[in-house]
């Protein structure tokens, strides 16, 4: 195989050819030295976030075909004055020191209630120290319970009418959290009708009040102007005391009007008594700013309407009570009830709300735990800056840091190659590199042709055939299921007594060989049985299964189709095999199958007679050769294949292979390169255009919603088989990145799978996944049946695995 090595800055990239997956990192460093002129001790190699260390192989790091390894050049230790040859990684001297979290301001850090019970007159201003007030959040417009912490004179800049908060920012509360907003919101409430005594406010403009919110002590001390303060509301108005036009304080949730929220000033617009217990109250909410009003707002808490207190009212302190109003509960499950156990807002294990000072909050999922409810329990609250619960904590022992040894996976430890004493280098074969992509246009158990793959398509390696979905196994000759049937097979001339007549050939089943350990090939050592893949291929015959004498189909065309791929390895027994690569030859049917003694090795084998049943001409016929020329079918190479290898024959190709060798499962370790490399300039003739059926043309005209897309797609008809690739790209779901299934054509003319759109709506995302056009919560998803029928015609079988 081959890999690429690129410098960390991307300035230089080189391809390392003929590298084995069993190659050690030391061997790789020598190859890099030859290409980049960087000594091994100066190399730092990275792959997928891991630093490659000596003592391991490319297989240990899962380096695959055409993967990129990054190279970082270390300073040469021999040219560094006063340093040893070993360079140790030290912490950067200018790294910022670790800052310890400031202690959270909580009830334990507040002055005692007895110390705050006494009112202190500062000698100026309307309000006294420790007085209970309502403070207006200048960014939100809502009123919150607070108390005066201290009173100071305003500076010259503050006395000119500005009301900045501490640090020049205002606060916005959402679900109990405080978010800072810009200074632009500080004067948004100037146009709201003031409910305070204007004379008192005018006389108190040069005073700054330092307040603390009672329910949000973590916000600290904030600076407030007198116009954003008023005495604490204490009087609940009865229904018969309310009148239209009154300005009162009500509870309202701006985001969810049907739930409890914050407290706002509001003007009553509608009072309606429906029954003795059912009343309707509608108000105009004052949010702040010139346009900060909400009209026709229905209030759900009609029994909690507070009278607005004017400056000069009797001052309240903590000695008179807390006078706290009910806000939106922080937890919807328990309603904020301190006596009710809740596993959502309290300890996840016991649900208790006791001993909050012994609860730890996970910095990842924000879930609380008592230190004694953990497993194992903790003796005290940890002093670390960050703490993570057991479900979020990453096991540091599983993290491989730079310079550390790899932790071998259990899967690799069980592989035969991990325990074998053989020194055979199996890592050079293309059958060992693994797929770089997977065919998803049809499921793996698809019978019949693969959409977009015409007869005569040829690939350089077997792994490419697997990626195209024509024959999924990298090595095995038969792909199928013993309880379903066979989907494809590879004719590679593994048995000398097989007969190939082109449109009809005999095929020998698999098994009967000792492939213990990590073997890929082996001599026959036992009789074959009609099990596993042999049984799967027999099920394709239109006859009852018989594992004794075999069977012959009643109507061979009625059998299940099998995709046949001829390999260049079959050239030794068949003139119909390609000279290079692996060629798709179309659909065959099983005519009959029977057991017999092989003339080459004397063991019992199962034979199958397959006959061609395909509308496309065979690639060895004159019609097939002409069609391949019109479709410009070329030998396909993998991405990144070294260009200097094209057209060259590798070592060992000219060696004569012994006759009678049995190679059913065979790798591509020694497969020859293409003897002829086709290029686009070899033929100046136009590619045969893709032909639409009358039914497809009619349905395309009927699909008016996607007319623009169809116009673009139909312009690629002249590209032949590439038309289907363009069609797949144009109708790909933006969510699952697959061809749309049960497509919903939105009002913005985008196509999305119905299941994908339903998952989006379930996640409360009610917009088009492609353009974010708002579809609305009540959007009706109607599948585009015309488009679904068209896609089934172009890609038969693709919806089977969805």
From Swiss-Prot:
Chain positions covered by the region annotation Required for interaction with histone H3: 117-311
Effect of residue 735 to S: No effect on autosumoylation, nor on ZNF131 sumoylation
GO molecular function: DNA binding; histone binding; histone H3K9me2/3 reader activity; RNA polymerase II-specific DNA-binding transcription factor binding; SUMO transferase activity; ubiquitin protein ligase activity; ubiquitin-protein transferase activity; zinc ion binding
Pfam families, per the entry: PHD (PF00628), SAD_SRA (PF02182), TTD (PF12148), ubiquitin (PF00240)
Record's disease association: Associated with various cancers. DNA copy number loss is found in multiple kinds of malignancies originating from the brain, breast, stomach, kidney, hematopoietic tissue and lung.
Record function comment: E3 ubiquitin ligase that plays important roles in DNA methylation, histone modifications, cell cycle and DNA repair. Acts as a specific reader for 5-hydroxymethylcytosine (5hmC) and thereby recruits various substrates to these sites to ubiquitinate them. This activity also allows the maintenance of 5mC levels at specific genomic loci and regulates neuron-related gene expression. Participates in cell cycle regulation by ubiquitinating cyclins CCND1 and CCNE1 and thereby inducing G1 arrest. Also ubiquitinates PCNP leading to its degradation by the proteasome.
Subunit structure: Homodimer; disulfide-linked. Binds methylated CpG containing oligonucleotides. Interacts with H3; the interaction has a preference for the 'Lys-9' trimethylated form of H3 (H3K9me3). Interacts with PCNP. Interacts with HDAC1. Interacts directly with CCNE1; the interaction ubiquitinates CCNE1 and appears independent of CCNE1 phosphorylation. Interacts with CCND1; the interaction ubiquitinates CCND1 and appears independent of CCND1 phosphorylation. Interacts with p53/TP53 and RB1. Interacts with UBE2I. Interacts with ZNF618. Interacts with UHRF1. Interacts with FANCD2. Interacts with ATR.
Official protein name in the record: E3 ubiquitin-protein ligase UHRF2
Species of the source: Homo sapiens
Gene name of the encoded protein: UHRF2
């Amino acid at each position: 195989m081959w890999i690429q090595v690129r410098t960390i800055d991307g300035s230089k990239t080189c391809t390392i050819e003929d590298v084995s997956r069993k190659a050690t990192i030391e061997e790789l460093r020598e190859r890099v030295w030859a290409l980049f002129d960087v000594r091994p001790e100066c190399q730092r190699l990275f792959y997928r976030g891991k630093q490659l260390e000596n003592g391991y192989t490319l297989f240990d790091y899962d380096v695959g075909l055409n993967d990129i390894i990054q190279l970082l050049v270390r300073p040469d230790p021999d040219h560094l004055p006063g340093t040893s040859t070993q360079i140790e990684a030290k912490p950067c001297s200018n790294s910022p020191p670790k800052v310890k979290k400031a202690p959270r301001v909580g009830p334990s850090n507040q002055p005692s209630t007895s110390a705050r019970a006494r009112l202190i007159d500062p000698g100026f201003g309307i309000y006294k120290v420790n007085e209970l007030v309502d403070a207006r959040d200048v960014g939100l417009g809502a009123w919150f319970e607070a108390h005066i912490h201290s009173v100071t004179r305003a500076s010259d800049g503050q006395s000119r009418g500005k009301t900045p908060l501490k640090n020049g920012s205002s606060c916005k509360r959402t679900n109990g959290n405080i978010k800072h907003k810009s200074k632009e919101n500080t004067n948004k409430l100037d146009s709201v009708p003031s409910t305070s005594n204007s004379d008192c406010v005018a006389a108190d403009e040069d005073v700054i009040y330092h307040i603390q919110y009672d329910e949000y002590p973590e916000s600290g001390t904030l600076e407030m102007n007198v116009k954003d303060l008023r005495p604490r509301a204490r009087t609940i108005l009865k229904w018969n005391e309310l009148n239209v036009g009154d300005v009162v304080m009500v509870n309202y949730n701006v985001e969810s009007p049907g739930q409890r929220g914050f407290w706002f000033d509001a003007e009553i617009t509608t009072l309606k008594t429906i029954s003795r217990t059912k009343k309707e109250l509608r108000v105009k909410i004052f949010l702040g700013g010139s346009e900060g009003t909400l009209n026709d707002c229905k209030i759900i808490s009609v029994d909690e309407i507070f009278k607005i207190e004017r400056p000069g009212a009797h001052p309240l302190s903590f000695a008179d009570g807390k006078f706290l109003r009910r806000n939106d509960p922080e937890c919807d499950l328990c309603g904020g009830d301190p006596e009710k156990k809740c596993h959502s807002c309290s300890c996840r294990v016991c649900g208790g709300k006791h001993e909050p000072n012994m609860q730890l909050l996970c910095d990842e999922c924000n879930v609380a735990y008592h230190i004694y409810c953990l497993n194992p329990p903790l003796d005290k609250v940890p002093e670390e800056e960050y703490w993570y619960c057991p479900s979020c904590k990453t096991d540091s022992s599983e993290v491989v840091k730079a310079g550390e040894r790899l932790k071998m996976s259990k899967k690799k430890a069980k592989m035969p190659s991990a325990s074998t004493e053989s020194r055979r280098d199996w890592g050079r074969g293309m059958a060992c590199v693994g797929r770089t992509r997977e065919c998803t246009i049809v499921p793996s158990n698809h019978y019949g042709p693969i959409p977009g793959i015409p007869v005569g398509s040829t690939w350089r390696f077997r792994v490419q055939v697997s990626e195209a979905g024509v024959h999924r196994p990298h090595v095995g000759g038969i792909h199928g299921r013993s309880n379903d049937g066979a989907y494809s097979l590879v004719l590679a001339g593994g048995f000398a007594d097989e007969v190939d007549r082109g449109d009809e050939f005999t095929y020998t089943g698999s098994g009967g060989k000792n492939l213990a350990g990590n073997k890929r090939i082996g001599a026959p050592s036992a009789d074959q049985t009609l099990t596993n893949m042999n049984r799967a291929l027999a099920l394709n015959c239109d006859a009852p299964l018989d594992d004794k004498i075999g069977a012959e189909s009643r109507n061979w065309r009625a059998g299940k189709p099998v995709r046949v791929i001829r390999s260049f390895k079959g050239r030794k027994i068949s003139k119909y095999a390609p000279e290079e690569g692996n060629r798709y030859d179309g659909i065959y049917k099983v005519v009959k199958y029977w057991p017999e003694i092989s003339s080459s090795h004397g063991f019992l084998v199962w034979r199958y007679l397959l006959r061609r049943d395909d509308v496309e001409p065979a690639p060895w016929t004159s019609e097939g050769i002409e069609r391949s020329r019109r479709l410009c079918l070329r030998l396909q190479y993998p991405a990144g294949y070294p260009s200097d290898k094209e057209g060259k024959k590798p070592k060992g190709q000219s060696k004569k292979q012994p006759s009678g060798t049995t190679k059913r499962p065979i790798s591509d370790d020694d497969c020859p390169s293409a003897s002829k490399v086709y290029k686009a300039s070899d033929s100046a003739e136009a590619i045969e255009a893709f032909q639409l059926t009358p039914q497809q043309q009619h349905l395309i005209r009927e699909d008016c919603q996607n007319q623009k897309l169809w116009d673009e797609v139909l312009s690629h008809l002249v590209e032949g088989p590439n038309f289907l690739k363009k069609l797949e790209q144009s109708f790909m779901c933006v969510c699952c990145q697959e061809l749309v299934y049960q497509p919903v054509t939105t009002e913005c003319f985008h196509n999305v799978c119905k299941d994908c759109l339903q998952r989006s709506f379930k996640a409360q995302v009610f917009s088009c996944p492609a353009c974010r056009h708002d579809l609305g919560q009540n959007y009706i998803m109607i599948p585009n049946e015309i488009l679904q029928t068209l896609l089934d015609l172009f890609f038969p079988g693709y919806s089977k695995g969805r």
